[in-house]
Amino acid sequence: MNVLDNFIKIKNSINSLSNTVKIIVVSKTFDINIINPIIKYGHNHFGENKVQEATIKWQPIISRYPSLKLHLIGNLQSNKAKDAVRLFNYIHSLSSEKLANILMKEENLINKKLKYFVQVNFSNLKERNGIKPNEATSFIKYCINDLKLEIIGLMCIPPLNENPNSYFFELKKIAIENNLHELSMGMSNDYLDALKNGSTYVRIGSKIFGERTNQ
């Protein structure tokens, strides 16, 4: 498994469509030794699902690579917010007023500003994380105006086994309505569709590292 070759191939294919799209290499469950070739190649954006795993993996090497940008792309529990603010630069799963308030307080405690994506949930499943589409605008305004969080864009994960294009289109529509310019959409199986719909951040893991044996 040559992860660097896989990454460069994907990077070149994406750059042929747009050279402004940021590729988040989703390195969850993989050891830092496997990720290292991509770091040494000069890539900066990496994504993780779990705060505890990410802290163990990245904390020892962050000081050696000051340009690294770490993205939390998984669901964030309130009791992990403190550690998340200290480690990550971006959070893609902002989805409740309670969490937003906690993150604001943690930012203020250490005088650090993160960049946030509001996660929009187009599924009717309650266990799916995210704000309902019809509640997105009021939530975005609350986070920006009341809490002074730096909301840069929106994120979504389309429902499984459905054509993602309509969901990507709808997410872009909500972003435009709220004057947000960044869209975190598209993973290994649908990033080309996401790019056609204006994605600015794609989250790619299995196309680079192969299928995970554990989640």
Language-model segments: residues:
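Short, basic/aromatic-enriched C-terminal tail that caps enzymatic domains
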Residues: 195-215
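Conserved alpha/beta-domain cores
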Residues: 1-182, 187-189, 195-197, 211
